[in-house]
Swiss-Prot record:
InterPro entries: Antimicrobial_frog_2. It is found in: Secreted. The keyword Secreted applies. Belongs to the frog skin active peptide (FSAP) family. Esculentin subfamily. Keywords: Amphibian defense peptide, Antibiotic, Antimicrobial, Disulfide bond, Secreted. Pfam families: Antimicrobial_2. GO terms for cellular component: extracellular region. It comes from the Eukaryota. Expressed by the skin glands. This is Esculentin-2Rb. It comes from Pelophylax ridibundus (Marsh frog). One of its GO terms (biological process) is defense response to bacterium.
Length: 37
């Protein structure tokens, strides 16, 4: 039902984030370390 739909969307979003978020995640980590988010 809805739960499996949400799970599917989350999985797809996770894949997209993993692809797109490589450099963004690095920037985010750096800004968290520098505490300047």
């Amino acid at each position: 039902g809805i739960f499996s739909l949400v799970k599917g969307v989350a999985k797809l979003a996770g894949k997209t984030l993993a692809k797109e978020g490589g450099k963004f995640g690095l920037e985010l980590a750096m800004c968290k370390i520098a505490k300047q988010c």
